[in-house]
Amino acid sequence: MAEFNGIRAIVTDIEGTTSSISFVHEVLFPYAAKHMDAFIRENFSAPAVAEQLDEVARLGGVDRKSPDALIKQLLDWIAEDKKITPLKALQGMIWRSGYDEGAYKGHVYPEVAERLRHWRELGIRLFVYSSGSVAAQKQIFGFSEAGDLTPLFSGYFDTRVGGKRDADSYRAIVREVSEPASSVLFLSDVPAELSAAAEAELQVCQLVRGAGIERQETYPAVASFADLLIKPA
């Protein structure tokens, strides 16, 4: 059990925190990789897709006019688990079709929905910060196994606000949330992200869900949202 006092807002990570790493790596990533080629070719000139392909060409140094080169770059980034904004945006577009077609539902750990509702009832605002695009974040919660959880959240942040291991990203989030940093709690399974948030003066807690997670000793850690005792300001 870990206790946190004076909390006005909670910012939560997704992968390894609200949702299993295996869902992302064994369901979502392969689905996007499988459908990337057809999606890019079918939507090559669509404005929303073209905007992201411009960035893929710029960041990857590949020929913007070549679907083959762009697709190869995107698939390479997926294989390397790169947190690159245009890749995440395009993955989100592909994942949406999977949700719409019922290919899968967004995984959330069993206690997550109840705890999120409880914190909202306490008057605490909830936010998401993930390397996945805002659209993908809304999908995993909007099409979750526990139903549509998006009404519980007040906002979403992705890599457009900055990298998750950069303290300035958390400072930017605090400005958007419009609460004192010390009244904002950040939840993540990744020690480097917790360190960056703590540097920005947020309260932090690590989620250690099962084996294979690097446990750090600097900050509080719990195995489940049910182990968090959060008292609002």
Curated annotation (Swiss-Prot):
Cofactor note (record)? Binds 1 Mg(2+) ion per subunit.
Provide any one GO MF term from the record: magnesium ion binding
Quote the EC number. Answer: 3.1.3.77
Catalysis performed (reactions) = 5-methylsulfanyl-2,3-dioxopentyl phosphate + H2O = 1,2-dihydroxy-5-(methylsulfanyl)pent-1-en-3-one + phosphate
Cite the Pfam families for this sequence: Hydrolase (PF00702)
Instruction: Note whether Magnesium occurs among the keywords.
Output: yes
Q: Which cofactors does the annotated protein need, by name? A: Mg(2+)
Per the record, the domain of life is Bacteria
Q: Which GO terms describe its biological process?
A: L-methionine salvage from methylthioadenosine
Its annotated function is as follows: Bifunctional enzyme that catalyzes the enolization of 2,3-diketo-5-methylthiopentyl-1-phosphate (DK-MTP-1-P) into the intermediate 2-hydroxy-3-keto-5-methylthiopentenyl-1-phosphate (HK-MTPenyl-1-P), which is then dephosphorylated to form the acireductone 1,2-dihydroxy-3-keto-5-methylthiopentene (DHK-MTPene).
Question: How the protein assembles, per its UniProt entry?
Answer: Monomer.
Which family does this protein fall into? Belongs to the HAD-like hydrolase superfamily. MasA/MtnC family.
* Name of the protein this chain belongs to: Enolase-phosphatase E1
Species for this entry: Hahella chejuensis (strain KCTC 2396)
